[in-house]
């Protein structure tokens, strides 16, 4: 079978990571991994520059291999068919932007060869495949800057049906008068930490750094249960 190489890209609220993948056997090509940290609340220019840096670094490690396309795992809400950012609360500076066109511009890969899927769905389908496809049904959950979910039913990614929430999503599921992601995500840690200390942080790492530096250590230990 002919080797077919594509870029596998994971975009999250704090980073972009990419690696060359051989679709003929779904293997990762060693020494092609690239990652750049960038927060989702930055300006569109900063975010896109970070993405471009990671993609070009990965492509530079391809050692002359022809890259046929890009597969992008992207958090919801996002128009995965058109490749357009839709979120107000995450990557807000990118809302309405055609991400497919932007990625094509910086990589030279045709827009028609750039595909998107939900990041949690990509995780769930990958886990199902690596598990040897032994189980007919699987639920995958991702916890990070957001709260993602993937439902595998009879070996297929499902977004509707018995036991599957609308769109196959849990992040916007009603919970305690708000949505689940407000409680099960980085955003909740940031909000609760500010309530307990009066100090704003960005990301859980910021909270850990303060704790390791000794600041708020006593308060954090005393407040751990209510946190």
Language-model features, listed with the residues they occupy:
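Conserved Rossmann-like nucleotide-cofactor binding loop
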Residues: 14
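N-terminal phosphate-binding loop and adjacent alpha-helix
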Residues: 29-65, 215-218
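Glycine/GP-enriched mid-protein hinge/lid loop-to-helix segment characteristic of carbohydrate kinases
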Residues: 5, 19-21, 31-32, 44, ...
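Glycine-rich beta-strand-to-loop/alpha-helix junction loops that act as flexible
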Residues: 70-76, 143-145, 227
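Amphipathic, non-transmembrane alpha-helical scaffold segments
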Residues: 48, 221-227
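Glycine-rich phosphate-binding loop and adjoining helix at the ATP-binding site
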Residues: 40-52, 66-70, 76-137
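N-terminal charged helix/coil linker that caps or initiates catalytic domains
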Residues: 1-6, 11
């Amino acid at each position: 079978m002919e080797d077919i190489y594509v870029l596998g890209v994971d975009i999250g609220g704090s980073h972009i990571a990419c690696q060359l993948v051989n679709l003929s056997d779904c293997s990762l090509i060693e020494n092609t991994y690239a990652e750049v940290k960038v927060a989702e609340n930055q300006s569109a220019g900063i975010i896109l520059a970070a993405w471009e840096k990671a993609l070009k670094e990965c492509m530079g490690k391809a050692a002359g291999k022809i890259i046929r396309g890009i597969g992008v795992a992207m958090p919801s809400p996002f128009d995965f068919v058109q490749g357009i950012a839709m979120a107000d609360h995450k990557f807000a500076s990118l809302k309405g932007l055609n991400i497919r066109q932007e990625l094509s511009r910086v990589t030279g890969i045709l827009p028609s060869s750039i595909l998107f899927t939900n990041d949690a769905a990509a995780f769930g389908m990958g886990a199902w495949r690596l598990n040897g496809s032994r189980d007919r049904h699987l639920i995958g959950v991702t916890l990070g800057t957001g709260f993602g979910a993937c439902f595998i039913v009879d070996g297929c990614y499902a977004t509707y049906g018995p036991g599957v929430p609308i769109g196959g999503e849990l992040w916007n599921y009603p919970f305690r008068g708000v949505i689940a992601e407000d409680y099960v995500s980085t955003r909740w840690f940031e909000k609760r930490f500010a309530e307990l200390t009066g100090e704003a942080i960005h990301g859980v790492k910021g909270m850990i750094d303060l704790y390791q530096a000794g600041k708020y250590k006593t308060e954090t230990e005393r407040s751990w249960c209510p946190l």
